[in-house]
Amino acid sequence: GGKPKVALRPPWINGFVWSETPSGAPWIGVTGQGDGGDNWWPCKDHPSDEPDEGMDISLTFPSGLVGLSNGRLINEVDNGDGTATTAWRVNYPINNYLVTVNIAPYVRIEERYHGIDGTLDEPLEFWVVPEYEQYARTMWRQMPRVLEVLGRRFGEYPFFDDKFAVVHAPYYGMEHQTVVAYGALFTDNDFGFDDLLLHEVAHEWWGNKITVADWADFWIQEGFATYAQALYVLDTLGESRYLDYMARLRQRVDHSHPVVQGKNLTSVQAYSDEIYFKGAWVLHSLRWLIGDEDFFSVVWRFANDPGYAYGLVSTQDLAMLVSEVSGREIDWFWERYL
C-alpha cells in the first residue's frame, strides 16, 4: 500500500521519476543518491550497512515495456494478464542507494569488450529509448576504449559476473551498480569523451566496488570518479592536455569549506562541489608529491587489495596506504588539503 515518493529534482532529491518518452510511452526510473534507498525499499539506509551478499530483485510492469534492475537477469515471464516480470540476482555487495528500477520501451545496443589483455569477450549493454537510438549508437562506440583505459589504471571492470550496462534515464544520471543511469545529451567534450558517461562509469570502481563507510569521506567516491576523467585525458591525449583538463576542474574549486567536514555526517551534510573538483585536485597534488610510481601503485592497490575491494573504506585507510607505499608521513598534506 501507499504511494511512492516522487523525486522532485532527480537525482539529487530522491524518489521515483514518472516520465514519458517523446512518443508518449511510460519512462520510469528511481534515484536514491546518498540517503534515500529507504524511500522505496526496506533497508538500514546508511553506507556502512550494505547488503554484503547481494540481493534478489523482482519487477512487474506492463507488457511491451522493458524492466531493468541491478545484477544479472535470471528469469523473465509473461504473466498472461498484460504484465511481465523480470527477476535479477546481484552477486556482489551493493550499497543501498545504488539499487534501482528502470522501465521503458528500451532498445538494446551492444558493443563487445575484450579486456586490457585481450582475453575477455564481454557484452557492453546500452538500453536507450527508441527516439535516441541513433545518437546512442554513435556514443556507445567509445565504451570499449573507456573501459580499457580505466581498467589499466584501476583493474578490470569489477562486476562482469553480473553485467555491464548503462540505461537511458529520464533524469541527469546516477552510478547505479551494473545499470548506470545516463540522461545527458550524447555529446562529447573537446577532449573526446562524454563527461557524464565517463564519470558515472568510473563510479563502478569508486563508489560501487570501493564504498565509504561514513558520508564524511564522500570525497573519495566523487573525487576519484572526477579524477578518472582527467586520467582518461592523460592516457589518451597526453600530459599537456591532462594539465589543461585539470585547469578546467580547478575553476570549479572555491574553497568554501573543508572537503572532509567532520565525522558521522549525512550525505546532505557532506555533499558539495568541493568533493568532486577539489577532491580531484587533492589526488592531482598527491601525484606530484609522491611521484607517479608510488601514486599509481596506491590507486591500483586501493581499488584491488582484498582489504578494500568490495568493502568499506575511509580517508584514514587511504592516508595509511599512501604512507605504506611511499614511505613518507604526510599528515600535513591531508590536514592542509582536506
Language-model features and meaning:
Residues P158, S240-R241, S272-L338:
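Amphipathic alpha-helical substructures
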Residues G37-S48, P130-T138, W215, T266-D273, ...:
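Active-site rim elements
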